[in-house]
């Protein structure tokens, strides 16, 4: 495409939000006018779907739930007074609690103030807060934050060990919608043990974010505080609920600024005009790039260190929402878009080589931040700063990819602050909603995650049966015999992996034989 034609295409498809200073450029996605004409009816339906969703329609039919994360920054749009109170009252509770903690009115029993936070949660309860903390927390926040987002014992130990004697001034936030998520439950129990081991009364250091009446809500009845999660907010869209706002506010982040930015972006993404709706432009680009079937991966490249966790946050938001086997009509469709990325220009020295010359199975989203830093920059050579290099690398990489027929989107923001981060969250939340409508999938449930939980529970049940069989046998058993005695002769491989793990962790299980040849192993207990 000639320079003048490409420049005109850029002008034709550039979106700019004046108040937010946001640019969305999809000119390097190679759709044509015929494609736009063909997809307009789908967007008419998508706009209607979003309108009905925001009015309180059951947008998650598999679970019979409303989908209301857009109301979190515009309570006046909630369908009734009860829902409005579910938004405004927790926000007030958060602000009052945070003020008391930061002033030292609410404090730990053996210290003047809380100095740190341990956030226990997984999935959306971790990825959103981690992204926001990395993007917005100051160099010296009023409270430092540490995350336990897995059931990895060594990872948990690392967090506790690094805190040293600051554990006595550390507030624990346990976030679980149902209270039944195993990883979060395990993290909570590990924290309780760590506090008690150090002579600390855990309930006086803990708060919960959960649904009223949940298992976690009952466990936390004597904790410092409980903050409600709404039934109509999913984990991956919960950053602007108590899930994300509480830890952000405790770090001194302006949560009202985040909500304001999200609200402004929501208003922009309600516009029923494809060219003037930034989230619709993203969904359009995703659909074209992947042929409406997720045939190409989404590579997210923010050229700003503080946005390095954006790709991990979007990975869940996009993949858990859109990665579905069935569509809303019950047809098998295998939908989804794979998301990965880190940051520029670091990635130019990692996998961009493949992006430029390897398998063309992707499209890139560049995130550009206009402000280099607060304050002036030195000149590394006449008239050139380190920020100029970064800006040059964005343009250069974009051009190099396009020349080799690799498409890209560029999102440009003025700076990284609470307002722009809130707007980014809202931009992508709506884009996912639109794309879900375009491909006719339920973007608000996660049956595959639930299937994984059930499978893991069955392995733990098998482990109990294996231990019982070993203790009752009182002698060495080969793997096949052990599997039979455990009641599962068809699960020899699973039994082998269970006993191998138990033996490695001094759980009383002993293995004799050639470890490289499982059929030679004899297993015993004692």
From Swiss-Prot:
Known catalytic reactions: alpha-D-glucose 6-phosphate = beta-D-fructose 6-phosphate
EC number annotated for this UniProt entry: 5.3.1.9
Molecular-function GO terms, alphabetical: carbohydrate derivative binding; glucose-6-phosphate isomerase activity; monosaccharide binding
Recorded superkingdom: Bacteria
Cellular component terms (Gene Ontology): cytosol
Subcellular location: Cytoplasm
Function, in words: Catalyzes the reversible isomerization of glucose-6-phosphate to fructose-6-phosphate.
HAMAP family: G6P_isomerase (MF_00473)
Stored CDD domains: SIS_PGI_1, SIS_PGI_2
Protein name per its UniProtKB record: Glucose-6-phosphate isomerase
A GO biological process held by the record: glycolytic process
Xref: Gene3D superfamilies: Glucose-6-phosphate isomerase like protein, domain 1
Principal cellular location given in the protein's record: cytoplasm
């Amino acid at each position: 495409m000639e320079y003048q034609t490409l420049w005109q295409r850029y002008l034709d498809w550039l979106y700019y939000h004046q108040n937010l200073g946001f640019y969305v450029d999809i000119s390097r996605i190679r759709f044509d006018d015929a494609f736009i004409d063909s997809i307009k009816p789908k967007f008419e339906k998508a706009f209607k779907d979003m309108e009905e969703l925001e009015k309180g329609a059951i947008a998650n039919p598999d679970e019979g739930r409303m989908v209301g994360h857009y109301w979190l920054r515009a309570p006046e749009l909630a369908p009734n007074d009860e829902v409005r109170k579910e938004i405004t009252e927790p926000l007030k509770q958060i602000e009052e609690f945070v003020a008391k903690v930061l002033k030292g009115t609410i404090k730990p029993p053996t210290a003047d103030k809380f100095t740190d936070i341990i956030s226990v949660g997984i999935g959306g309860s971790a990825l959103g807060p981690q992204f926001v903390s990395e993007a917005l927390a100051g160099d010296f926040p009023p409270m430092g934050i540490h995350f336990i987002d897995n059931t990895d014992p060594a990872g948990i130990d690392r967090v506790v060990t690094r805190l040293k004697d600051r554990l006595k001034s550390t507030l624990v936030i346990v976030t679980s919608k149902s209270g039944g998520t195993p990883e979060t439950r395990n993290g909570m129990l590990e924290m309780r043990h760590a506090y008690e081991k150090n002579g600390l009364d855990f309930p006086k250091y803990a708060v919960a974010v959960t649904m009223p009446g949940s298992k976690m809500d009952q466990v936390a009845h004597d904790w410092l505080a409980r903050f409600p999660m709404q039934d109509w907010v999913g984990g991956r869209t919960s950053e602007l609920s108590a899930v994300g706002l509480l830890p952000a506010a405790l770090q001194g982040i302006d949560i009202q600024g985040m909500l304001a930015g999200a609200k402004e972006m929501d208003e922009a993404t309600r516009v029923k005009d494809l060219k003037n709706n930034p989230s619709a432009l993203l969904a359009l680009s995703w659909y074209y790039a992947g042929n409406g079937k997720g045939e190409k991966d989404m590579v997210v490249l923010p050229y700003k260190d503080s946005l390095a966790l954006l790709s991990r946050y979007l990975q869940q938001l996009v993949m858990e929402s859109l990665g579905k086997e069935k569509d809303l009509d019950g047809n098998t469709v295998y939908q989804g878009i794979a998301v990965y990325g880190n940051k520029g220009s670091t990635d130019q020295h990692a996998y961009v080589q493949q992006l430029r010359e390897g398998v063309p199975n992707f499209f890139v989203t560049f995130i550009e931040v206009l402000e280099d830093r607060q304050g002036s920059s030195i000149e590394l050579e006449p008239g050139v700063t380190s920020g100029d290099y970064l800006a040059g690398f964005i343009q250069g990489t974009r051009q190099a990819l396009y020349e080799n027929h690799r498409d890209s989107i560029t999102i440009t923001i003025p700076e990284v602050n609470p307002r722009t981060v809130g707007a980014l969250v809202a931009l992508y939340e709506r884009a996912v909603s639109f794309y879900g409508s375009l491909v006719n999938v339920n973007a608000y449930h996660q049956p595959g995650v639930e299937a994984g939980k059930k499978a893991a529970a069955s392995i733990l049940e098998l482990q109990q049966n294996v231990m019982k069989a070993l203790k009752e046998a009182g002698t060495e058993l080969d793997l096949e015999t052990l599997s039979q005695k455990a009641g599962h002769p068809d699960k020899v491989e699973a039994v082998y992996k269970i006993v191998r793990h138990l033996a490695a962790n001094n759980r009383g299980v002993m293995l004799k034989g050639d470890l490289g040849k499982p059929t030679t192993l004899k297993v015993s207990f004692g």
